[in-house]
Amino acid sequence: MWPLMAPCVSLIPFLPGLSGARVFYVRDLSQYFWGRYLWLRRAWLSGEWPLWDPYVGAGQAAYSDALNQMFLPPAILARLIGGEVLGFNLWVTLPFPLAAVGAWLFFSRRFSAAASAIGAIAFAVCGPIVSTGNAPNLSWSVAVLPWALWGTDRVVSAPTTRNLAILAASIALQSLAGEPVTLFTTLALVLVYAATIGDRARSNDLAGATRSVISTGAASALGIAIAAIQLWPTIHASSLAERAGSITTDGWSLRPTALIETVWPHLFGNFFETRSLADVPWMPLLYTGREPLLFSIYFGVPLLALAAFGLAGNGDRRWRLFWVAAGMIGIVTSFGAYTPIYPFLRDHVPPFGLFRFPVKYFVVTAMAVAAGATAGWEGLERTIAGRDETRDLLDARRLTRARLLSIAFPAAIGSSVLLFAAACVYLSAPTAGSLAVFARALGDEKGTGAAEWMLRTVRQDAAPIVLVSFVATALFALLTVPRKRFVAVAGRGLLGTLVVADLLVRASGINPVLNAAHFAEPEWLSHVKAYPDARFYVGGKREGSLSGMDIDGSRGYVDAPGLTGSASRAALSIQAAFYPSPWQAREILTFDLPVLWPKAFSDMSNRFFDESSEARERLLDRTGVRYRVLPQRRAGDRVPLVRIPQFYESFLFDFGDTVTPRVSIVPTSRVVAQVRTQVDALFESGWDSRAIVLVDRDVPPTGTRGHAVQPFARIIEDSSNRTLVEAGVGPQDGYLLFLDSYSEDWRATVDGQQATIARADGLWRAVRLSPGRHHVEFLYRPRALAVGAAISLGGILCLLGLVLLGTRHRYNAWIVWSS
C-alpha cells in the first residue's frame, strides 16, 4: 500500500488535465511547449524524425535543442499516447508520480515504508516541485533526481554491476531531459553523498570512501556517455550561440524575503489571477522584475516542522548534516544576485557562468525538506510510551531539541501571522507606513501602492495559515513525547493527513487547465499558409512576450471572451503564434528560448528591436516576410486582411511580392567575409538584395552546363530534413539564394554533383550554378549528432556489458549455491 500511495497522491493536483478536453497552459506550456509537442508528434506519427525545424527562426536545428526531448524514451512514449491533448497532458503529468516512486525507493532504504511514503509525497507534491510542471524539461529532470540518489545509495552500499547500471541509467535519463542546472546539481550531490554517506564514510575508511566516489563518478560518466546523443549536439550548439558569450545569469534570482512564501503562499501576489505585473506590485520586487519562475515555493508549516524534527533529532548524524547542508546551499544559491556568493561562483567557476535562473537550485532544498520529513516521521513512530530511545544523555538532548523546535516553529509562525494580520486591520496607518518603507527599500519608487495592496490581501489570506500552524503546534506537542500506542497512531494519522492535505490544497492551482478549443490553430494563419514559402511577423512580439511599447506592437491587449488572468494570457500566446511549427507557418523573428541558435541570428534579432521603422522594413523585405501583424498606423494605406483576436489595434497585412522570395537566382555576388557585416547590411539602404548577394567566399559553379534560360527558382519538394529546388540560370553563372538559415551541416548537390554552400547575406544558404536548368537538393546531415550517437552507442554497449556481467555472476553464484 505505501509504495502506491505516494505516486497516487502526486497525481491528484494534475487530475483536471487527464482528459482530452482541457490543456495545461501556464506560461511556457502555451507559448512554446504546446507548439513543439504538436509539431514533433505529428512528424513522428507521419513517419518522419525531424532534425531541422524549417518554420521557426527561418529554420533552426531541432535535434540539438534538448527542450524537444527527442531522445528521452519515456517522454517520447508519453507524447504518443492517446489524442493530442491527452498526450500533451501526460507529458506534463508523468514526471510527478515518477518522482514520487524514486523518492520512495531512496528513502525506503533507510526508513520505514510509511515514513518513506510521507517523504515521497513531501517531495513530489511540495510547491517548488509541482511548479516545475510549466517546463517539462525541468520537471522530467527533477523527477530523476531521487532515482539518481537511490542508485548512488545502492552503489555506496554495494558497488555491484547492477547498482552501477542503475545509477548510470538514472544519470543518462536526467541528461536526456534537457535541464543543465539540475543535471549539474545532481552530479555534485551524488558525488558528495558518496563521499560522506555510507558504511565506509561512517567508519572513516578513507580508501573505501574514495572507492565509493570513484564508482559513483564512473557510473555517472557512463550515464553521460549514454546521453551523448543529446548532450554533444547541445554543447556544440551552445558553443556557436550567444550562450557561449555573455547571457543574463541573474534573472529569476530568489530574494531572501520571498522565503516567507514557503509558509504563506502568494503573499506577494498570485500570478494566475493578475492581468499584469502592475496589479501585483510586490512580485517584481522579489523576483528580479518579473513573475516567479517557480509559481510556488510552498512547503507549509506542518511539513517544515516535521522536517525540523527529523533533521534535529536522533537519526543518523551524517545523514542529517548532509541534508541540512544541502538544503542551506540550495537556498543560498537560489538567492543568485542577492548575495555575493553566487555572483562569485558565476564569474570564477566555469559551469555556473553557463547557467541561467539560480532559483532552480531550490529543488535541492525541496529534496532536503523531504529527507527531513522522512526522518521526522520515523522519529515520531519511535516515540511510543514504553520504548526507550534515549539511551544516553546526548540522545536525550537531541530529542529535546527536536521536540522544542517542532513545537516552537509552527507556534512562532502562527503567532507572527496573527499579529501581522491584526496590525493590518487595527493599526492600518502605521503598518502601511512601515510596508511602504520596506517596499521602497526593495526598489519600489513610492511604496504606497504596494502597502495598500498588502493591507487588502493579508486580511483574507491569514486565517488558514494561522489555523494550520496552531493545529500543527498541538499535534507536535502531543506526538513528540511518549504516548500510548493508540494515541500515537491516531495522532500520526491526523498529522499525516494535515501535511498531505495542506500540500494538496496549495498545489491544486499551480498547474491549471484551459479548454482545448483555445489551443486551436489561429484562424489568421490560414492567409499566411496560402503561400507556403512566405513568412510572417507579429509586431510587438519580442523576448518571449508581447510589448505594447514596441513601435510595431499593439498598444494594448484584451482578454479572450470568458477568460481572465493567466488563462487569457495563454489564449493570447496561441493567437500570437509564439511557436508556429505545428501549423506549418514560417517565421524569422522567433524567440530563442534555450539560447541555442547561431550568434548571427541573435545579432540580427537584437539589432532589429533596436532599429528604426525604416530599417526594420528593409530587414523584413529582404528576409521574405510577406505577412505582417501591425497596427494600421504602421501599414500605411494597405487594406488589412483580418483583425487579430485579443490585439487591441493590430491587423494582418499582405505586403505582396515586394519582398524577396524564399528561393531566387541572384546574378551578382560580392565577397564579404565578416558575418556581422553581412547581417548589418540587411538593415542598411543602398543595396538591392535581389540583384547582389553577399557571400563569405567565392565558390565554384556547379551543375551540368546547359542552354541558358530565363532565371527562375521554385521549390518542388520540401520537408524538415530535405529540400529539392528546380532552378534555371541565364548565360552567366548565378547564385541560387535560399532564404533558410545557414548551417555547416547542410549538404547540397546540383544535378547529382556535390556543391559548396556559401553563407549568404549573413543568414542564408547560397549555391553557385552554371547556366541552364538544374535540380538542387539540400540534405541535413548534422555531424554533431553522428558523433553523439557514436558515443551513446559505446555507452549503451558498456551498460549492457555491465548487466550481462552481473547476470553471469549471479548465475554462477546460483550454480554454486544449488550444488
Question: What does each of the following model-derived ranges do?
Answer:
Residues 1-727, 733-741, 814-819:
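Conserved luminal/periplasmic juxtamembrane motif of membrane-embedded glycan-processing enzymes
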Residues 5, 712-715, 781-818:
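Glycine/proline-rich low-complexity spacer/linker segments in large multi-domain proteins
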